[in-house]
């Protein structure tokens, strides 16, 4: 009597099982991404990290208050949806916070910032090798740097306003790197379309470290040090 050969069927079943497990993992990975929505008054004494699997959405008119020396860090994706009449405000609980920070892992995830005002900060927005789209950003009186780009950062920045910076630490700072408006460094290549930079202690635009980019429609005034340094 001839014994049936079940090997092809077993092989097919194993392949089908592997495909099913693979698809199951894909669905699970997609479902693990979470969305957090902020509105009203948000208080962050120790700052906040947007994880790589998280989307943070900030509603118009939201005030985000951050503890001194802390920041809002982005590993994942952030959507700041301020408007002209209801901007999102980022301020400090006490002392100076360290602003909004885009880390390398946020690159390519589609972060957008619109109508954000940053006040009472040491740094306004810092970008490490990421590519957020930022429009209608206002940074008032950042002690060190209003917008700081590192590590091949490639943001699109439209209608930037930087007002004041460095006055509160002038004569006390232990580094020259204070009172700077836009710093483009370490191979960064931003596109900046429209910027008003006024009332800074050290530099309006600081360009260094083999960086490039396209800058247009810049108005720079009342800089105590160098208007531009390249």
What are these regions (language model features)?
Residues 23-230:
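Beta-strand/loop edge motif enriched in small/polar residues
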């Amino acid at each position: 009597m001839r014994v049936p050969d079940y090997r092809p069927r077993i092989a097919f079943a194993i392949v089908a099982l592997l495909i099913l497990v693979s698809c199951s993992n894909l669905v699970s990975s997609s479902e693990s991404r979470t969305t957090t929505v902020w509105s009203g008054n948000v208080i962050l004494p120790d700052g906040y990290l947007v994880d790589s699997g998280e989307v943070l959405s900030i509603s118009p008119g939201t005030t985000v208050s951050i503890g001194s020396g802390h920041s809002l860090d982005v590993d994942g994706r952030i959507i700041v949806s301020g408007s002209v009449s209801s901007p999102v405000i980022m301020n400090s609980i006490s002392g100076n916070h360290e602003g909004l920070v885009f880390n390398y892992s946020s690159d390519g995830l589609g972060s957008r910032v619109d109508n954000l005002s940053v006040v009472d900060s040491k740094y306004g927005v810092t970008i490490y090798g990421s590519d957020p789209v930022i429009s209608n950003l206002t940074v008032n009186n950042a002690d060190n740097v209003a917008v700081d780009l590192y590590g091949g950062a490639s943001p699109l920045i439209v209608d930037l306003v930087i007002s004041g910076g460095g006055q509160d630490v002038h004569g006390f700072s232990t580094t020259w790197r204070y009172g700077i408006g836009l710093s483009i460094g370490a191979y960064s290549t931003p596109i900046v379309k429209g910027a008003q930079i006024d009332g800074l202690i050290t530099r309006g635009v600081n360009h260094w470290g083999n960086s490039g980019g396209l800058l247009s429609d810049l108005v720079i005034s009342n800089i105590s040090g160098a208007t531009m340094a390249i």
